[in-house]
Amino acid sequence: EVDAGSCNGCEIEIGGLTSPVYDSERFGIHFVASPRHADLLLVTGPVTRNMEIPLLKTYEATPHPKLVVAVGDCAQTCGVFRGGYAVVGSVDQVIPVDVFVPGCPPEPAAILRGILAALDRLPRR
């Protein structure tokens, strides 16, 4: 998960995915410490000037095939941060996005649906 400049509301909801209620691991979803071990990047917030290059490097470090899920209104439209001096733009203005999950913040169930929709795009093994 990459916080590109969010208020952390989406991160709180992402944390709920590992709770017994949503149990994202039952779908084979595991949060990893390195993009080199990831199939998918969750990105939150508008992309700030300080996070533009780190986001690009994280995307480049993720092996192919790679997926990106932009979580929250700010990731999609910059939300309340639109026009801010420190904001570069939405996530899709910096890296390709496969699925957008709208909401401010979106509920864990919506985030889980977005992740599963993105994973459906991966070739079957």
Give the ranges of each region predicted by the language model.
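Iron-sulfur-associated redox domains of electron-transfer enzymes in respiratory
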Residues: 1-125
